[in-house]
């Protein structure tokens, strides 16, 4: 992960813990995430480990009929952050035979980041909605309609108030130093990084979905379900004054919802033939620990789905094609796996070889089930049976796997320290383990 991503993710956590503020991934794209910019949501995004959006070259104003410009976004507040990337420094902790936990010392940030939060005012949106109709024949809208793409409008942004150069130096790759040569996680690297963030750079943002109905009517609902498409002439919208709102039931985000979501996606993968599942496992096994290649595969599948192309993976027989629902499900799990660190991905490869994925899945499921809505850091007991069946090496692998998500497991007790900031990463780990467990059951 780049330093810019570290900064934007840390900023989003500080301003809106476990909320819907999305950190910007790429510095070069910041001009395409200003208020009223149109963006695409990556396929199979989920709020459980963070939705991701892709830039377009258009704004909402570009696809409306000509008319008056909306008023400037409203300033919601100014904020200042210093040493945002500093982490807690821990002393060396010896764990039996094969693992040493080290604090990531030497990480520093020498500058103060000053930001401001800006939002499109409700009155500005209402006036725009009343005064300007949709340009129904706009080529961009025609293309998006043809490929059934959902469009989202940037409604709120966090911007840098001044140009700032952030620096850091680190003397370790990760928190864990495992004495397992096959994982390639030993050793440390001394490196320095710096990133210059220009004045006005968007660092994080909030979006709302654009809904298009009729020939030239549009709306930006306050509430919108995932299965509501942007282009839907049959959708029912209610007007309250000049505000368009979607009729929608209340959504509950808890562990049961995550579990149901993951089960639905695994069911689609399960529909593959045994040969297809085995070949998919082979392909993923070669890519785990190679995060860039996983991301490339994700982009390739997204592009194929957008254009309606058939897809085969390298390890799949030529007659085993991935149908759309299976590709959607694989994209969902790729999104989860790419949220994990390369160290975690390498540990998953070893865990797969050692056949300990079922235990690891139960452990993560138990922790999330107990603490999903817990918003304070605390120490909780761990069921002894969750780790007692593992040998020494497998227990260390499992502790490191969840530890790299930010969850500290202590054998004394046993117990673990829950940190709400780790929830998103643990959700991604839960989904990744669910897929690999399913695929490895036949092997």
Swiss-Prot record:
Tell me the null mutant phenotype.
Answer: Mice lacking Gsdma, Gsdma2 and Gsdma3 are highly susceptible to subcutaneous group A Streptococcus (GAS) infection in an animal model.
Q: Which GO terms describe its cellular component?
A: cytosol; perinuclear region of cytoplasm; plasma membrane
Family annotation (InterPro entries): Gasdermin (IPR007677), Gasdermin_pore (IPR040460), Gasdermin_PUB (IPR041263)
Q: Which domain of life is it from?
A: Eukaryota
Binding-site list for a cardiolipin: 9-13
Which is one Pfam family of this protein?
Gasdermin
Post-translation changes: Cleavage relieves autoinhibition by releasing the N-terminal moiety (Gasdermin-A2, N-terminal) that initiates pyroptosis. In contrast to Gsdma, not cleaved by bacterial effector protein SpeB. Palmitoylated.
Residues in a coiled coil are 249-312
Quote the tissue specificity entry. Answer: Expressed in the gastrointestinal tract, specifically from the middle to the upper region of the gastric mucosa in the glandular stomach.
Instruction: Name the residues that span the membrane.
Output: 78-95, 99-120, 164-179, 183-197
Q: Where is this region: Triggers pyroptosis?
A: 1-249
Task: Name any Gene Ontology BP term.
Answer: programmed cell death
- Per UniProt, which keywords does this protein have? Cell membrane, Coiled coil, Cytoplasm, Lipoprotein, Membrane, Necrosis, Palmitate, Transmembrane, Transmembrane beta strand
Let me see what the UniProt entry remarks about domains.
Answer: Intramolecular interactions between N- and C-terminal domains are important for autoinhibition in the absence of activation signal. The intrinsic pyroptosis-inducing activity is carried by the N-terminal domain.
What family does this belong to? Answer: Belongs to the gasdermin family.
Query: Under what name is this protein listed?
Result: Gasdermin-A2
């Amino acid at each position: 992960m780049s330093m810019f991503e570290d900064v934007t993710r840390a900023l989003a956590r500080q301003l809106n813990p476990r909320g819907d503020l999305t950190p910007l991934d790429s510095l070069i794209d910041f001009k395409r995430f200003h208020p009223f910019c149109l963006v695409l949501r990556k396929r199979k995004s989920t709020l459980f480990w963070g939705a991701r959006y892709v830039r377009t070259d258009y704004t909402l104003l570009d696809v409306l009929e000509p008319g008056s410009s909306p008023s400037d976004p409203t300033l919601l507040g100014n904020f200042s952050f210093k040493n945002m990337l500093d982490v807690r420094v821990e002393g060396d902790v010896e764990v039996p035979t094969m693992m040493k936990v080290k604090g990531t010392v030497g990480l520093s940030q020498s500058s103060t980041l000053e930001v401001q939060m800006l939002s499109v005012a409700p009155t500005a949106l209402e006036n725009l909605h009343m005064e300007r109709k949709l340009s129904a024949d706009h080529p961009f809208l025609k293309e998006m309609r043809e490929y059934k793409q959902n469009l989202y409008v940037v409604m709120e942004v966090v911007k840098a108030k001044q140009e700032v150069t952030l620096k850091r130096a680190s003397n370790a790759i990760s928190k864990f130093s495992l004495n397992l040569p096959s994982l390639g996680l030993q050793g440390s690297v001394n490196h320095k990084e710096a990133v210059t963030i220009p004045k006005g750079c968007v660092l994080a943002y909030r979006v709302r979905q654009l809904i298009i109905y009729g020939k030239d009517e549009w709306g930006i609902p306050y509430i919108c379900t995932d299965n509501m498409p942007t282009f839907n002439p049959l959708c029912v919208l209610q007007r309250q004054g000049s505000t368009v709102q979607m009729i929608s039931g209340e959504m509950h985000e808890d562990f049961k919802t995550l579990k149901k979501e993951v089960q639905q996606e695994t069911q689609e993968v399960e529909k593959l033939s045994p040969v297809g599942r085995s070949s998919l496992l082979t392909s993923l096994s070669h890519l785990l620990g190679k995060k860039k290649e996983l991301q490339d595969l994700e982009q390739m599948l997204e592009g194929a789905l957008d254009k309606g192309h058939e897809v085969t993976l390298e390890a799949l027989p030529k007659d085993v094609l991935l149908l759309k629902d299976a590709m959607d499900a694989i994209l969902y799990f790729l999104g989860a796996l790419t949220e994990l660190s390369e160290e975690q991905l390498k540990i998953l490869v070893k865990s797969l070889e050692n056949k300990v994925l079922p235990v690891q899945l139960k452990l993560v499921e138990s922790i999330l089930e107990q603490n999903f809505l817990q918003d304070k850091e605390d120490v909780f007991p761990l069921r002894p049976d969750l780790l007692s069946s593992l040998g020494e090496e497998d227990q260390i692998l499992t502790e490191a796997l969840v530890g790299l998500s930010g969850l500290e497991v202590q054998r004394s007790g046993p117990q673990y320290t829950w940190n709400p900031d780790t929830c998103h990463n643990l959700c991604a780990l839960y989904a990744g383990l669910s897929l690999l467990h399913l695929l490895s059951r036949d092997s």
